[in-house]
A protein has these predicted regions:
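Short, acidic/polar
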Residues: 53-67, 123-130
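Active-site groove signature of glycoside hydrolases
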Residues: 65-88
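Beta/alpha (TIM)-barrel catalytic core signal, keyed to glycine-rich beta->alpha loops juxtaposed to Asp/Glu
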Residues: 9, 81-269
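Short, flexible, mixed-charge acidic loops at enzyme active sites
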Residues: 30-40, 183-187
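Active-site mouth loops of central-metabolism enzymes
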Residues: 42-58, 90-92
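Short amphipathic alpha-helices and their capping/turn segments at secondary-structure boundaries
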Residues: 3-16, 57-72, 154-167
């Protein structure tokens, strides 16, 4: 649905005026309308199956191009490969399919000028490290693993990216909500209720951020923007006002105290 909406908006605009990234790894087919599917509210009436093979990636890519009204994609992410989504057994099969034929299909798409770059879009670091041992990736979109609360992408993964020149895009920088809302009742962390030790950690970092002249959300965003391994930061929003608030936070003039605070946070990596 998002691709169809975006495609309708962009179809009459010059293609060189914008950059599009999208995902492969799930193949859609017509299905019944459901109010909620895998956390998505009122999705387009499709059935979805995971398929990381070359055939599945090609099918998913071509369907995305059709919905987006374009014949090429700038960045193509292989989405949700890993144990986090599939569990140990299923991920083993999916990863084997991807390495056997999926990677070659991505390379063909790039050689044919259909995509400019490809990589992973995931919520865990281990699958990135595992795949990078076999494949040179252009980019990785890592969600929630390089933030004020979770530094698990740092060290080994960031080091590998620097060594081979893989760009790192940071998503999920608010850890699904709590670093934007603060430790309030109902706050979410990693798509679920925030546990007490996370609530306590957020309270402490918010106090220090405020002392440096930053809101909690500003601190989370500026940390991501200033991290030395960050090529770009992905912000998701469902409201115009929250988008504007995030843009204002990204463009905030940083005082010496604020920069010193961010530097201390980075030094803890």
């Amino acid at each position: 649905l998002s691709e169809q909406r975006l495609g309708s908006f962009l179809r009459h605009k010059p293609r060189n005026d914008y950059v599009i990234s999208t995902k492969v790894g799930r193949v859609l087919s017509p299905g019944e309308h459901r109010a909620e599917v895998d956390g998505y509210m009122n999705p387009w009436p499709n059935n979805a199956r995971y398929d990381y093979s070359g055939k599945g990636i090609r099918e998913s890519f071509e369907a995305s191009c059709e919905r987006l009204h374009t014949d090429y994609i700038d960045i193509l992410y292989v989405h949700d490969l890993g144990v986090y989504t599939h569990g140990e057994k299923e991920n083993e099969a999916h990863t084997a399919n991807f390495l056997a034929t999926g990677v070659d299909e991505l390379k063909r798409l790039k050689a044919d000028g259909k995509i400019a770059a490809f990589g992973l879009g995931v919520n865990e670091t281990k699958i990135c490290i595992d795949v990078m041992k076999h494949v040179l990736l252009d980019v990785i979109l890592i969600a929630g693993r390089l933030s004020l609360l979770d530094r698990s992408a740092d060290s080994e993964l960031t080091g590998m990216c620097r060594e081979v020149g893989t760009s790192l895009v940071l998503g999920g920088i608010f850890n699904s909500g709590i670093l934007a809302t603060g430790a309030k009742s109902g706050a979410t962390y990693d798509y679920g209720p925030a546990p007490e030790h996370i609530l306590d950690a957020v309270r402490k970092v918010e106090v220090k951020a405020n002392q440096a002249g930053l809101s909690l959300a500003e601190a989370a965003l500026q940390f991501a923007l200033h991290h030395p391994s960050s090529t770009s930061v992905l912000l998701g929003t469902g409201k115009v006002e929250s988008l504007q608030r995030n843009l204002d936070a990204a463009n905030k003039t940083m005082t010496a105290a604020a920069m010193a605070f961010i530097s201390v946070l980075k030094a803890k990596d």
